């Protein structure tokens, strides 16, 4: 789950991490009131969307008076911001962050992720702050400093100093401030079950202060059950509606660009199914794993999600019956197809427990359901059916 910048900074303040004074607003008049509360004669207006690259897309603007402020907020609210991290439709702008300006002398990058190779949290720092860190990692990986944290003892102050001096910094007062910031970020990361934390940029002001000018936070979805405060921060308007619907039924769904819908039980089998569709000349429209308990209700909801994608011209169902019986799965598929009213061809491959009985039920259903003879046959059949429609 992703957070907006204003939500991320709200968390940073709870951990005594310095951020600029700011207010989130939902209309132009509130922006003027926020500016008066913040003070000063210039402000930064930031569109709140779950995507990077806002500045280049016009989503971050410097305003020099309250008339410009009101105009900028009015121009951004209700629009869809398209950045290099969004699709062509962009993300809806429903909130604006009005923030005080900062006297920037230097921009740094600071981040933390879970490294799957070492199975530990890794903190990263770079002198290349304020730019797309992905490009830095690709073109100049030597400019990214890393420290790996031993979970038995946690982040240690000497590791913070290691990053500090690695950035070419020397001032002792700044070192104490930097250490406090990194230690605070580590506590935030571990206590709130984060999967990604980025401060980009971490700025050094003209007076030598360190301030977190922008913040990006991703939370581990698997831990949301114990993070009730963060769970309430979810903004479903920033998420794909199909994926949101799938989460309600504990279905693992990711929308893709093809026209062949996929419903599979098991993530590995789902990936193999998409590979075989591509190998057979087709394009999968989604990844959808219904999990081990492919009940009638979940199968029905899975079909609803798949057919809600208007690009879908056919559906491939690939089920391996281990504990669950294939004949019961067949009953669920037939019932779901009737209930949802699917008018595109459906190819079903059943393998495992009672697979032959399940295939017979599908064949006897008098519906537009094709029982495949095997994995490869299933992929070839659905590609053929979709090709006929096209």
UniProtKB/Swiss-Prot annotation:
Enzyme class: ligase
Cofactor(s) this protein requires: Mg(2+)
UniProt keywords, alphabetically: ATP-binding, Ligase, Magnesium, Metal-binding, Nucleotide-binding, Tricarboxylic acid cycle
ATP-grasp domain residues: 9-245
SUPFAM superfamilies from the UniProt entry: Glutathione synthetase ATP-binding domain-like, Succinyl-CoA synthetase domains
Gene Ontology biological process terms in this record: succinyl-CoA metabolic process; tricarboxylic acid cycle
InterPro entries to which the protein is assigned, alphabetical: ATP-grasp, ATP-grasp_succ-CoA_synth-type, ATP_grasp_subdomain_1, Succ-CoA_synthase_bsu_CS, SUCC_ACL_C, Succ_CoA_ligase-like_bsu, Succinyl-CoA_synth-like
Cellular component terms (Gene Ontology): cytosol; succinate-CoA ligase complex
EC numbers: 6.2.1.5
Catalysed reaction equations from the record: succinate + ATP + CoA = succinyl-CoA + ADP + phosphate; GTP + succinate + CoA = succinyl-CoA + GDP + phosphate
Record pathway: Carbohydrate metabolism; tricarboxylic acid cycle; succinate from succinyl-CoA (ligase route): step 1/1
Comment on bound cofactor: Binds 1 Mg(2+) ion per subunit.
Tagged with keyword ATP-binding: yes
Binding positions for Mg(2+) per the UniProt entry: 200, 214
Family designation: Belongs to the succinate/malate CoA ligase beta subunit family.
HAMAP family in the cross-refs: Succ_CoA_beta (MF_00558)
Quaternary structure note: Heterotetramer of two alpha and two beta subunits.
Name this polypeptide is given: Succinate--CoA ligase [ADP-forming] subunit beta
Lineage of the species this protein comes from: Bacteria, Pseudomonadati, Pseudomonadota, Gammaproteobacteria, Legionellales
